[in-house]
């Protein structure tokens, strides 16, 4: 059978339950970004340290790089789709099987060599303070085929979605140069339109006519599923799959991001301005309570 090309549209109702898909162990606490690149086609951040294990993985897969995709408009820009719903953008985290193979180049030659985690970006009216760390670096790589040191403290854990249930399938890298197992989190992280628009100001490598060309979009359209391609789901996706992610409660996600922002202010100002820090942590507790009760109400509505 022909190789399944990526990306794809995931039909949640056709995904197959698999008891082997346990929660992933994500160890990004020691991952450090070293350089950020404008490849002329996308933004790439190279990492040192960090790995994933657990779940269905036979051993540890070390983090290699992060790639970001977007579109001309905020309404679309992700490579993968969930029930034909396209998100504003997509982050791909590329990992390789270091225990089994001696290098990334060697690992990409094998169907168990690469694992790619996909995180969707959804534009709302609230800035993501963690994603802003990446946005702040873009001025240093505005020209195509340039790279620069990533000169800011950045914790990749903060870009993980609030729910880590996932879909998985065997496909290819986005450029189809190698096989890859995909792990796709259907719960997105939220960013602001201004943050995403900054990526569209980067120059592309197609500059043959002497005029500046910008990377206004770089996402790929989905490929048709092969007859033998199987998509699996984990955890509580079986319940979430009855409702398309496009219909999720965006207000709850906005509150969750606001809570994270308040907590970051608390950590930042606890030494400099204790009064402001106390106000921030009070808001964290209030928002946590609101989210708890709204989550219970939302769960009851889905059951009815």
Swiss-Prot record:
GO terms for cellular component: membrane; viral envelope; virion membrane. GO terms for molecular function: carbonate dehydratase activity; zinc ion binding. SMART domains: Carb_anhydrase. GO terms for biological process: symbiont entry into host cell; virion attachment to host cell. The keyword Acetylation does not apply. Residues 295-304 are intravirion. It is found in: Virion membrane. The chain crosses the membrane at residues 276-294. PROSITE patterns: ALPHA_CA_2. Keywords: Disulfide bond, Host-virus interaction, Late protein, Membrane, Transmembrane, Transmembrane helix, Viral attachment to host cell, Viral envelope protein, Virion, Virus entry into host cell. Residues 1-275 are virion surface. Residues 1-235 form the Alpha-carbonic anhydrase domain. Induction: Expressed in the late phase of the viral replicative cycle. Apparently non-glycosylated. InterPro entries: CA_dom, CA_dom_sf, Carbonic_anhydrase_a-class. Binds to chondroitin sulfate on the cell surface to provide virion attachment to target cell. Homodimer; disulfide-linked. PANTHER family: CARBONIC ANHYDRASE, CARBONIC ANHYDRASE 7. Belongs to the alpha-carbonic anhydrase family. This is Cell surface-binding protein OPG105. It comes from Vaccinia virus (strain Western Reserve). The gene is OPG105.
